[in-house]
Amino acid sequence: MNVIPCSINTLKGLYDISGVEVGQHLYWQIGGLQVHAQVLITSWVVIAILLGSVTLAVRNPQTIPADGQNFFEYLLEFIRDLSKTQIGEEYGPWVPFIGTMFLFIFVSNWSGALLPWKIIQLPHGELAAPTNDINTTVALALLTSVAYFYAGLSKKGLSYFGKYIQPTPILLPINILEDFTKPLSLSFRLFGNILADELVVVVLVSLVPLVVPIPVMFLGLFTSGIQALIFATLAAAYIGESMEGHH
C-alpha cells in the first residue's frame, strides 16, 4: 500500500532535481531585453585585455621586431597559415575573422583559470570565463554559420544551394540537417570542455589541499588552448568547404 506514495515522492524528488540550475545568474534589464550580466562583464574584460595587449605591442613598430611585436607577428603568421591551409588561396579576407575567433576563445578560456573572478562579489551568482556559458559559445557558433553561408553565397550566388542535392536529391534532408548540426557541435563542444574543466578544479580544491589540483589546472590550460585551436580550425574548414566546387 505504501508503494504508490513512495513512487510519487521519488518522482517529485527527481522533478525537483531536474529544475536545479548550474550556478546562479545576474541579469540586467536594458530596454526590453534581459541581458546576462556576468557574460557581458567578463567578455568586456577579455576584449579589453586583447585590445590593450595589441596596442602596447604595436604602438611603436620597429623594422626589426622585438618583444611584444615579435610575438604578435608570429601569432599573425600562425593564423594566416591556419586560414590558408583550411580555406585555400582565397584565405586573405577571412584572416581577421578566424584570428578574432581564435584569440577571443583562447583568452576567454585562459581567463577562467588565471584571473581571480571569484574575488568580485555580485548580488547573484559569480563571474567565470565567457566560454563557460552556453550563450557565448552558441553566439560564436552562429557567427561561424553566418560566415560560411556568406562565403558560399558570395562565391557562387544562388547556385550555392545546389550542394544540398549533391550527389543525389535523396540526401536533401540530411544535407540541410548537417548545416544545423555544425553550430550545435561547435558550441556544445567548447562549452562542455570549459565547464567540465572548471568544475573538476573546483571539486578538487574543495576536497583536497591546494597543491594537489595544480597539475589539473595546468592540464586545463593546455586543453583550453587546444579547444580554441579546434574551434578556429573547424570554422576555417567550414568556410573553405562552402567555397569549394561540388564533387
Swiss-Prot record:
Cellular component, GO annotation: chloroplast thylakoid membrane; plasma membrane; proton-transporting ATP synthase complex
Signal sequence region: none
Topology of this chain in the membrane: Multi-pass membrane protein
Record InterPro entries: ATP_syn_F0_a_bact/chloroplast, ATP_synth_F0_asu, ATP_synth_F0_asu_AS, F0_ATP_A_sf
Keyword Cell division found: no
SUPFAM superfamilies assigned: F1F0 ATP synthase subunit A (SSF81336)
Keyword Thylakoid attached: yes
Main location: plastid
Organism superkingdom: Eukaryota
Localization, UniProt: Plastid, Chloroplast thylakoid membrane
The protein's role, per its UniProt record: Key component of the proton channel; it plays a direct role in the translocation of protons across the membrane.
Family in the record: Belongs to the ATPase A chain family.
Subunit-structure text: F-type ATPases have 2 components, CF(1) - the catalytic core - and CF(0) - the membrane proton channel. CF(1) has five subunits: alpha(3), beta(3), gamma(1), delta(1), epsilon(1). CF(0) has four main subunits: a, b, b' and c.
Protein's name according to its UniProt entry: ATP synthase subunit a, chloroplastic
Annotated organism of origin: Lemna minor
